[in-house]
Amino acid sequence: METLQRTANRGSISTDTSFQVDNSLKTDEHAGEYFYRNSPTAGNKRTFTFSFRIKRTQLTGYVADPYLMSQGSNQRFHFAGDSLRFMFDGNSTELEASGRLRDTSAWYHVVLAVDTTQSTAANRVKAYLNGQDYPWNNTKYPSQNSESGWMSGSSMYFNTRDGDGAYHNSAYWAEVVVIDGQQLSATDFGEFDSDTGIWKPKNVSGLNFGNEGFYLNFQDSSDLGADVSGNNNDCTLNNIAAADQSTDTCTNNFCTINVINLSTQTLTEGATKIVSTDNTSRTSFGTMAVSKGKWWWEGKIQVYESADSYPCIGVTGDLDNPPATSAQLWKGNHVVVLAKAQKWVTNDTGYSYGTAYADNDIINIALDMDNHIMYTYKNGTIDDASGINFSSQSAATADDFYIPINLVYVTGGGSSWEMNFGGFANYTISSGATDDNGYGTFEYAPPSGYYALCTKNLEEYG
Protein backbone atom coordinates (compact mmCIF):
# COMPACT_ATOMS: atom_id res chain seq x y z
CA MET A 1 0.00 0.00 0.00
CA GLU A 2 1.50 3.30 -1.14
CA THR A 3 1.38 5.56 1.93
CA LEU A 4 3.12 8.81 2.76
CA GLN A 5 4.91 8.54 6.09
CA ARG A 6 6.91 11.27 7.79
CA THR A 7 10.25 9.92 6.55
CA ALA A 8 9.23 9.78 2.90
CA ASN A 9 10.35 12.18 0.18
CA ARG A 10 7.50 12.69 -2.26
CA GLY A 11 8.37 15.25 -4.96
CA SER A 12 7.47 18.86 -4.25
CA ILE A 13 6.20 18.66 -0.67
CA SER A 14 8.29 21.66 0.33
CA THR A 15 7.99 22.84 3.93
CA ASP A 16 10.27 25.89 3.72
CA THR A 17 9.32 29.55 3.43
CA SER A 18 10.24 30.01 -0.25
CA PHE A 19 7.65 30.24 -3.04
CA GLN A 20 4.39 28.65 -1.95
CA VAL A 21 1.52 27.41 -4.10
CA ASP A 22 -1.76 28.29 -2.39
CA ASN A 23 -4.35 26.58 -4.56
CA SER A 24 -5.04 23.81 -7.01
CA LEU A 25 -7.97 22.76 -9.17
CA LYS A 26 -9.80 19.50 -8.51
CA THR A 27 -11.01 17.66 -11.61
CA ASP A 28 -13.22 14.57 -11.60
CA GLU A 29 -13.58 12.08 -14.43
CA HIS A 30 -17.07 11.10 -13.29
CA ALA A 31 -18.28 14.71 -13.56
CA GLY A 32 -16.74 15.37 -16.99
CA GLU A 33 -14.63 18.26 -15.69
CA TYR A 34 -12.05 19.90 -17.97
CA PHE A 35 -10.80 23.33 -19.07
CA TYR A 36 -9.60 24.74 -22.38
CA ARG A 37 -8.16 27.74 -24.20
CA ASN A 38 -10.83 28.50 -26.76
CA SER A 39 -9.78 29.22 -30.38
CA PRO A 40 -6.47 30.97 -29.71
CA THR A 41 -4.42 32.78 -32.32
CA ALA A 42 -1.72 30.49 -33.71
CA GLY A 43 1.62 30.69 -31.91
CA ASN A 44 5.00 29.11 -32.58
CA LYS A 45 4.22 25.59 -33.80
CA ARG A 46 7.86 24.50 -33.68
CA THR A 47 8.96 25.72 -30.26
CA PHE A 48 6.92 25.64 -27.05
CA THR A 49 6.90 24.34 -23.46
CA PHE A 50 4.17 22.92 -21.22
CA SER A 51 4.58 22.71 -17.44
CA PHE A 52 2.10 21.63 -14.77
CA ARG A 53 1.92 19.94 -11.40
CA ILE A 54 -0.54 17.14 -10.88
CA LYS A 55 -1.68 14.81 -8.11
CA ARG A 56 -3.57 11.84 -9.49
CA THR A 57 -6.68 10.50 -7.74
CA GLN A 58 -7.44 7.80 -10.30
CA LEU A 59 -5.17 5.52 -12.30
CA THR A 60 -5.22 4.01 -15.77
CA GLY A 61 -7.38 0.93 -15.63
CA TYR A 62 -10.29 2.84 -14.13
CA VAL A 63 -10.29 5.15 -17.18
CA ALA A 64 -8.48 4.08 -20.34
CA ASP A 65 -5.61 6.44 -21.17
CA PRO A 66 -6.83 9.60 -19.38
CA TYR A 67 -5.77 12.76 -21.17
CA LEU A 68 -3.64 15.59 -19.84
CA MET A 69 -3.76 17.84 -22.92
CA SER A 70 -4.94 17.76 -26.51
CA GLN A 71 -5.19 20.15 -29.44
CA GLY A 72 -6.78 18.75 -32.56
CA SER A 73 -7.15 15.07 -33.40
CA ASN A 74 -3.42 14.36 -33.87
CA GLN A 75 -1.92 16.27 -30.93
CA ARG A 76 -2.23 14.43 -27.63
CA PHE A 77 -0.48 14.26 -24.28
CA HIS A 78 -1.94 11.56 -22.07
CA PHE A 79 -1.35 8.62 -19.76
CA ALA A 80 -0.82 5.19 -21.29
CA GLY A 81 -0.56 2.46 -18.68
CA ASP A 82 0.26 5.26 -16.18
CA SER A 83 3.28 6.37 -18.26
CA LEU A 84 3.33 9.59 -20.27
CA ARG A 85 2.68 9.48 -24.02
CA PHE A 86 3.11 12.49 -26.32
CA MET A 87 1.88 12.76 -29.88
CA PHE A 88 3.52 15.66 -31.77
CA ASP A 89 1.54 15.26 -34.98
CA GLY A 90 0.01 11.82 -35.45
CA ASN A 91 1.27 8.30 -34.73
CA SER A 92 4.48 8.80 -36.71
CA THR A 93 5.73 11.18 -34.00
CA GLU A 94 4.44 9.44 -30.88
CA LEU A 95 6.77 9.19 -27.88
CA GLU A 96 6.16 7.17 -24.73
CA ALA A 97 8.16 7.35 -21.52
CA SER A 98 9.15 4.41 -19.34
CA GLY A 99 8.44 5.38 -15.73
CA ARG A 100 4.94 5.08 -14.30
CA LEU A 101 3.20 7.79 -12.30
CA ARG A 102 1.27 5.58 -9.89
CA ASP A 103 1.79 7.24 -6.51
CA THR A 104 -1.57 8.83 -5.66
CA SER A 105 -0.16 10.28 -2.44
CA ALA A 106 2.33 12.41 -4.41
CA TRP A 107 2.43 15.56 -6.47
CA TYR A 108 4.28 15.26 -9.78
CA HIS A 109 5.85 18.08 -11.79
CA VAL A 110 5.70 17.43 -15.54
CA VAL A 111 7.53 19.52 -18.15
CA LEU A 112 7.31 18.91 -21.90
CA ALA A 113 9.66 21.07 -23.98
CA VAL A 114 9.64 21.08 -27.80
CA ASP A 115 11.96 22.70 -30.35
CA THR A 116 11.98 21.07 -33.77
CA THR A 117 14.67 23.47 -35.04
CA GLN A 118 17.25 21.47 -33.05
CA SER A 119 19.66 19.52 -35.26
CA THR A 120 19.86 16.63 -32.76
CA ALA A 121 16.62 14.63 -32.88
CA ALA A 122 16.66 13.74 -29.17
CA ASN A 123 16.70 17.44 -28.27
CA ARG A 124 13.53 18.23 -30.20
CA VAL A 125 11.12 16.78 -27.61
CA LYS A 126 12.32 16.65 -24.01
CA ALA A 127 10.41 15.65 -20.91
CA TYR A 128 11.18 16.18 -17.22
CA LEU A 129 9.58 14.61 -14.17
CA ASN A 130 10.18 16.21 -10.75
CA GLY A 131 13.24 18.04 -12.08
CA GLN A 132 14.91 15.05 -13.73
CA ASP A 133 15.13 13.94 -17.35
CA TYR A 134 12.25 11.64 -18.19
CA PRO A 135 13.56 9.44 -21.02
CA TRP A 136 11.46 8.23 -23.92
CA ASN A 137 11.19 4.53 -24.74
CA ASN A 138 11.18 5.06 -28.50
CA THR A 139 12.74 7.47 -30.98
CA LYS A 140 9.80 8.70 -33.06
CA TYR A 141 11.00 12.27 -32.93
CA PRO A 142 9.59 14.91 -35.29
CA SER A 143 11.71 15.85 -38.26
CA GLN A 144 13.79 19.01 -38.09
CA ASN A 145 11.81 22.25 -38.47
CA SER A 146 8.50 20.41 -38.67
CA GLU A 147 5.34 22.08 -37.43
CA SER A 148 2.44 20.49 -35.61
CA GLY A 149 -1.09 21.30 -34.51
CA TRP A 150 0.20 22.24 -31.08
CA MET A 151 0.05 26.03 -30.60
CA SER A 152 -2.22 26.25 -33.65
CA GLY A 153 -5.48 28.17 -33.88
CA SER A 154 -7.56 25.24 -32.64
CA SER A 155 -8.67 25.06 -29.02
CA MET A 156 -6.21 23.60 -26.49
CA TYR A 157 -7.86 21.22 -24.02
CA PHE A 158 -6.76 20.07 -20.58
CA ASN A 159 -8.10 16.96 -18.86
CA THR A 160 -9.94 15.65 -21.91
CA ARG A 161 -9.41 14.47 -25.47
CA ASP A 162 -10.01 17.39 -27.83
CA GLY A 163 -13.22 18.36 -26.07
CA ASP A 164 -15.13 15.24 -27.07
CA GLY A 165 -16.27 14.65 -23.52
CA ALA A 166 -14.16 11.54 -22.97
CA TYR A 167 -10.90 10.36 -21.39
CA HIS A 168 -10.98 12.75 -18.45
CA ASN A 169 -8.51 12.71 -15.57
CA SER A 170 -9.37 12.61 -11.89
CA ALA A 171 -6.65 14.73 -10.36
CA TYR A 172 -5.57 17.95 -8.69
CA TRP A 173 -3.88 20.46 -11.03
CA ALA A 174 -1.56 23.31 -10.03
CA GLU A 175 0.74 25.84 -11.71
CA VAL A 176 -0.35 25.20 -15.31
CA VAL A 177 1.99 27.05 -17.69
CA VAL A 178 2.14 27.23 -21.49
CA ILE A 179 5.18 28.94 -23.04
CA ASP A 180 4.95 30.09 -26.66
CA GLY A 181 8.25 30.32 -28.59
CA GLN A 182 10.77 28.86 -26.10
CA GLN A 183 12.01 25.41 -25.19
CA LEU A 184 12.60 25.72 -21.45
CA SER A 185 13.96 23.20 -18.94
CA ALA A 186 12.66 21.96 -15.60
CA THR A 187 14.90 24.40 -13.72
CA ASP A 188 12.93 27.31 -15.17
CA PHE A 189 9.96 26.11 -13.13
CA GLY A 190 11.51 24.50 -10.07
CA GLU A 191 14.63 23.74 -8.05
CA PHE A 192 15.96 21.16 -5.62
CA ASP A 193 15.91 22.24 -2.00
CA SER A 194 19.48 22.55 -0.75
CA ASP A 195 18.65 20.91 2.60
CA THR A 196 16.11 18.21 1.78
CA GLY A 197 16.72 17.54 -1.90
CA ILE A 198 12.98 17.85 -2.53
CA TRP A 199 11.97 19.30 -5.89
CA LYS A 200 10.05 22.50 -5.22
CA PRO A 201 8.41 25.15 -7.42
CA LYS A 202 9.78 28.52 -8.39
CA ASN A 203 7.81 31.71 -8.90
CA VAL A 204 7.21 31.65 -12.67
CA SER A 205 5.47 35.01 -12.95
CA GLY A 206 8.63 36.60 -14.40
CA LEU A 207 8.94 34.19 -17.34
CA ASN A 208 8.43 35.32 -20.92
CA PHE A 209 5.23 33.47 -21.83
CA GLY A 210 5.13 34.55 -25.49
CA ASN A 211 2.04 35.89 -27.22
CA GLU A 212 -0.06 32.73 -26.87
CA GLY A 213 1.32 31.53 -23.54
CA PHE A 214 -0.61 31.58 -20.28
CA TYR A 215 -0.32 30.79 -16.57
CA LEU A 216 -3.12 29.38 -14.40
CA ASN A 217 -2.62 29.47 -10.62
CA PHE A 218 -6.28 28.83 -9.66
CA GLN A 219 -6.22 31.40 -6.85
CA ASP A 220 -9.42 33.22 -7.82
CA SER A 221 -12.29 30.84 -7.04
CA SER A 222 -14.69 33.08 -8.96
CA ASP A 223 -12.52 32.85 -12.10
CA LEU A 224 -10.53 29.62 -11.95
CA GLY A 225 -9.60 29.84 -15.62
CA ALA A 226 -7.96 33.25 -15.25
CA ASP A 227 -4.59 33.70 -16.99
CA VAL A 228 -2.27 35.57 -14.60
CA SER A 229 0.66 35.82 -17.03
CA GLY A 230 -0.42 39.28 -18.17
CA ASN A 231 -1.58 37.99 -21.57
CA ASN A 232 -5.21 37.55 -20.52
CA ASN A 233 -5.36 34.25 -22.39
CA ASP A 234 -8.05 32.94 -20.07
CA CYS A 235 -9.32 29.38 -20.16
CA THR A 236 -12.95 28.27 -20.29
CA LEU A 237 -14.25 25.81 -17.68
CA ASN A 238 -16.51 22.83 -18.31
CA ASN A 239 -18.52 21.53 -15.33
CA ILE A 240 -16.03 23.25 -13.01
CA ALA A 241 -17.23 25.61 -10.26
CA ALA A 242 -15.74 27.66 -7.43
CA ALA A 243 -16.19 24.67 -5.12
CA ASP A 244 -13.58 22.77 -7.16
CA GLN A 245 -10.79 25.01 -5.85
CA SER A 246 -8.52 23.20 -3.39
CA THR A 247 -5.71 23.98 -0.94
CA ASP A 248 -4.09 20.59 -1.55
CA THR A 249 -0.98 21.68 -3.45
CA CYS A 250 2.57 20.75 -4.36
CA THR A 251 3.91 22.79 -1.43
CA ASN A 252 1.39 21.49 1.11
CA ASN A 253 0.18 18.00 0.24
CA PHE A 254 -2.94 16.80 2.12
CA CYS A 255 -4.13 13.33 2.99
CA THR A 256 -6.80 11.82 0.73
CA ILE A 257 -8.32 8.36 0.32
CA ASN A 258 -5.90 5.93 -1.29
CA VAL A 259 -7.05 4.72 -4.70
CA ILE A 260 -4.51 1.87 -4.75
CA ASN A 261 -6.38 -0.36 -2.30
CA LEU A 262 -9.93 -0.06 -3.58
CA SER A 263 -11.88 -3.06 -4.79
CA THR A 264 -15.45 -2.36 -5.88
CA GLN A 265 -15.92 1.02 -4.21
CA THR A 266 -16.27 4.19 -6.25
CA LEU A 267 -13.86 7.00 -5.38
CA THR A 268 -14.62 10.52 -6.61
CA GLU A 269 -14.31 14.22 -5.70
CA GLY A 270 -10.55 14.46 -5.42
CA ALA A 271 -10.31 11.09 -3.63
CA THR A 272 -12.50 12.31 -0.76
CA LYS A 273 -15.85 10.63 -1.48
CA ILE A 274 -16.12 6.85 -1.32
CA VAL A 275 -19.26 4.90 -2.12
CA SER A 276 -19.91 1.21 -1.47
CA THR A 277 -23.12 -0.23 -2.86
CA ASP A 278 -22.61 -3.98 -2.92
CA ASN A 279 -23.46 -6.53 -0.26
CA THR A 280 -19.91 -6.80 1.10
CA SER A 281 -17.76 -5.13 3.75
CA ARG A 282 -15.31 -2.72 2.12
CA THR A 283 -12.31 -0.90 3.57
CA SER A 284 -10.52 2.25 2.44
CA PHE A 285 -7.47 4.04 3.80
CA GLY A 286 -5.84 7.43 3.92
CA THR A 287 -2.61 8.28 2.12
CA MET A 288 -0.75 9.51 5.21
CA ALA A 289 0.28 7.60 8.33
CA VAL A 290 1.49 9.00 11.67
CA SER A 291 3.27 7.65 14.74
CA LYS A 292 3.22 10.79 16.89
CA GLY A 293 1.52 14.16 17.13
CA LYS A 294 -2.16 15.14 17.34
CA TRP A 295 -4.36 15.07 14.26
CA TRP A 296 -7.83 16.13 13.15
CA TRP A 297 -10.10 15.23 10.24
CA GLU A 298 -13.80 14.95 9.41
CA GLY A 299 -16.10 12.49 7.71
CA LYS A 300 -19.68 13.08 6.62
CA ILE A 301 -22.07 10.14 6.50
CA GLN A 302 -23.78 10.65 3.19
CA VAL A 303 -26.31 7.83 3.07
CA TYR A 304 -27.45 4.60 4.66
CA GLU A 305 -28.83 2.41 1.90
CA SER A 306 -29.88 -0.37 4.22
CA ALA A 307 -30.92 -0.95 7.79
CA ASP A 308 -27.96 -3.33 7.96
CA SER A 309 -25.39 -0.79 6.79
CA TYR A 310 -22.78 0.21 9.39
CA PRO A 311 -20.32 2.90 8.28
CA CYS A 312 -17.14 2.88 10.38
CA ILE A 313 -14.41 5.48 10.76
CA GLY A 314 -11.15 5.47 12.70
CA VAL A 315 -7.53 4.31 12.39
CA THR A 316 -5.55 1.12 11.95
CA GLY A 317 -1.99 0.25 12.86
CA ASP A 318 -1.97 -2.87 10.69
CA LEU A 319 -0.81 -1.22 7.49
CA ASP A 320 0.20 -4.54 5.95
CA ASN A 321 -2.82 -6.49 7.18
CA PRO A 322 -5.75 -4.08 7.55
CA PRO A 323 -9.26 -5.28 8.42
CA ALA A 324 -11.24 -6.47 5.43
CA THR A 325 -14.36 -7.68 7.24
CA SER A 326 -16.44 -6.62 10.22
CA ALA A 327 -15.13 -9.55 12.29
CA GLN A 328 -11.55 -8.44 11.72
CA LEU A 329 -12.38 -5.00 13.13
CA TRP A 330 -12.48 -6.51 16.59
CA LYS A 331 -9.00 -7.97 16.31
CA GLY A 332 -5.59 -6.44 15.74
CA ASN A 333 -4.40 -2.85 15.86
CA HIS A 334 -7.60 -1.03 14.94
CA VAL A 335 -9.59 1.74 16.61
CA VAL A 336 -12.91 2.52 14.94
CA VAL A 337 -16.31 3.94 15.74
CA LEU A 338 -19.37 2.11 14.39
CA ALA A 339 -21.49 5.07 13.42
CA LYS A 340 -24.82 3.31 13.74
CA ALA A 341 -24.20 0.88 16.59
CA GLN A 342 -22.99 3.52 19.07
CA LYS A 343 -19.78 1.57 19.65
CA TRP A 344 -16.09 2.26 19.75
CA VAL A 345 -14.25 -0.93 18.87
CA THR A 346 -10.70 -1.82 19.92
CA ASN A 347 -8.85 -4.75 21.48
CA ASP A 348 -11.78 -7.15 20.94
CA THR A 349 -14.01 -4.88 23.04
CA GLY A 350 -16.89 -2.53 22.25
CA TYR A 351 -17.44 0.65 24.25
CA SER A 352 -20.67 2.62 24.09
CA TYR A 353 -20.77 6.34 23.36
CA GLY A 354 -23.62 8.90 23.19
CA THR A 355 -26.21 8.99 20.45
CA ALA A 356 -26.00 7.19 17.13
CA TYR A 357 -24.98 9.09 14.04
CA ALA A 358 -27.40 9.74 11.20
CA ASP A 359 -27.33 10.74 7.55
CA ASN A 360 -25.43 13.99 6.94
CA ASP A 361 -23.85 14.03 10.39
CA ILE A 362 -20.20 15.04 10.41
CA ILE A 363 -17.95 12.86 12.55
CA ASN A 364 -14.72 14.48 13.70
CA ILE A 365 -11.68 12.40 14.62
CA ALA A 366 -9.14 13.79 17.09
CA LEU A 367 -6.21 11.36 17.12
CA ASP A 368 -3.68 11.80 19.92
CA MET A 369 -0.73 9.65 18.89
CA ASP A 370 1.43 10.92 21.75
CA ASN A 371 -0.88 9.28 24.29
CA HIS A 372 -2.59 6.79 21.96
CA ILE A 373 -6.13 8.04 22.50
CA MET A 374 -8.78 8.63 19.84
CA TYR A 375 -11.64 11.04 20.46
CA THR A 376 -14.77 11.31 18.34
CA TYR A 377 -17.11 14.24 17.87
CA LYS A 378 -20.60 14.44 16.41
CA ASN A 379 -21.12 17.70 14.55
CA GLY A 380 -18.42 19.35 16.63
CA THR A 381 -19.55 18.02 20.03
CA ILE A 382 -17.35 15.45 21.72
CA ASP A 383 -18.92 12.03 22.32
CA ASP A 384 -16.91 11.17 25.43
CA ALA A 385 -14.18 13.34 26.91
CA SER A 386 -12.26 10.22 27.97
CA GLY A 387 -11.90 8.99 24.42
CA ILE A 388 -10.76 5.47 23.65
CA ASN A 389 -7.29 4.45 24.78
CA PHE A 390 -5.40 2.06 22.52
CA SER A 391 -1.95 2.29 24.13
CA SER A 392 -1.90 -1.46 24.84
CA GLN A 393 -2.04 -2.39 21.16
CA SER A 394 1.17 -3.91 19.85
CA ALA A 395 1.49 -1.27 17.14
CA ALA A 396 1.14 1.50 19.73
CA THR A 397 3.73 0.04 22.10
CA ALA A 398 6.14 -0.25 19.16
CA ASP A 399 5.47 3.38 18.13
CA ASP A 400 4.35 2.14 14.73
CA PHE A 401 2.37 4.18 12.25
CA TYR A 402 -1.41 4.44 12.26
CA ILE A 403 -3.46 5.44 9.23
CA PRO A 404 -7.01 6.77 8.75
CA ILE A 405 -9.50 4.07 7.82
CA ASN A 406 -13.11 3.84 6.67
CA LEU A 407 -15.04 0.62 6.52
CA VAL A 408 -18.57 0.04 5.29
CA TYR A 409 -19.82 -3.05 7.10
CA VAL A 410 -22.96 -4.24 5.31
CA THR A 411 -25.23 -7.24 5.07
CA GLY A 412 -27.39 -5.47 2.51
CA GLY A 413 -27.20 -2.23 0.56
CA GLY A 414 -24.30 0.10 1.24
CA SER A 415 -23.32 3.59 2.29
CA SER A 416 -20.83 6.33 1.60
CA TRP A 417 -18.42 8.70 3.29
CA GLU A 418 -17.41 12.20 2.26
CA MET A 419 -14.04 12.71 3.91
CA ASN A 420 -12.39 16.04 4.64
CA PHE A 421 -8.73 15.98 5.65
CA GLY A 422 -8.55 19.74 5.16
CA GLY A 423 -7.41 20.08 1.55
CA PHE A 424 -10.74 19.55 -0.20
CA ALA A 425 -14.30 18.72 0.86
CA ASN A 426 -17.17 17.80 -1.42
CA TYR A 427 -19.75 19.11 1.05
CA THR A 428 -20.38 22.80 1.67
CA ILE A 429 -18.35 24.21 4.55
CA SER A 430 -19.94 27.21 6.25
CA SER A 431 -17.40 27.97 8.98
CA GLY A 432 -14.05 27.55 7.21
CA ALA A 433 -12.21 26.64 10.43
CA THR A 434 -8.46 25.92 10.29
CA ASP A 435 -5.93 24.41 12.65
CA ASP A 436 -3.61 26.54 14.80
CA ASN A 437 -1.15 26.83 11.91
CA GLY A 438 -3.84 28.08 9.54
CA TYR A 439 -3.90 24.86 7.50
CA GLY A 440 -6.95 22.92 6.41
CA THR A 441 -10.55 24.01 5.96
CA PHE A 442 -13.02 22.28 8.27
CA GLU A 443 -16.65 22.63 9.25
CA TYR A 444 -15.65 22.28 12.91
CA ALA A 445 -12.51 23.78 14.41
CA PRO A 446 -9.81 21.39 15.63
CA PRO A 447 -9.11 21.50 19.37
CA SER A 448 -6.00 23.46 20.28
CA GLY A 449 -2.90 21.43 19.49
CA TYR A 450 -4.56 19.21 16.87
CA TYR A 451 -3.54 19.64 13.24
CA ALA A 452 -4.62 18.78 9.71
CA LEU A 453 -2.95 15.80 8.03
CA CYS A 454 -0.74 17.65 5.56
CA THR A 455 2.97 17.72 4.81
CA LYS A 456 3.55 21.11 6.44
CA ASN A 457 2.24 19.75 9.72
CA LEU A 458 3.84 16.32 9.32
CA GLU A 459 7.24 17.99 9.01
CA GLU A 460 6.68 19.88 12.26
CA TYR A 461 4.70 17.48 14.42
CA GLY A 462 4.68 14.06 12.72
Regions found by a protein language model. Give the residues of each.
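Low-complexity, glycine/proline/serine-rich flexible segments
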Residues: M1-R46, S83-R85, G90-S92, S152-S154, ...
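Extracellular glycan-interaction patches encoded by glycine-rich segments
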Residues: T93, S148-W173, V408-T411
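Extended recognition patches within non-cytosolic domains
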Residues: M1-N23, H30-A31, S119-A121, P135-Y141, ...
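Glycine-aromatic-enriched beta-strand/loop faces of beta-sandwich-type recognition domains
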Residues: D89, C312-I362
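Extracellular glycan-recognition modules
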Residues: A31-R85, Q118-A121, Q182-T187, V290-K292, ...
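Short surface loop/edge beta-strand patches of beta-sandwich-type extracellular domains
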Residues: E29-F48, E94-R102, D162-G165, K200-G206, ...
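Extracellular glycan-interaction surfaces
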Residues: T3-E29, S51-T60, Q75-S146, V345-Y353, ...
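Short hydrophobic/aromatic patches on beta-strands that form ligand-binding or substrate-lining surfaces
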Residues: F50-Q58, V110-L112, F158, S170-V178, ...
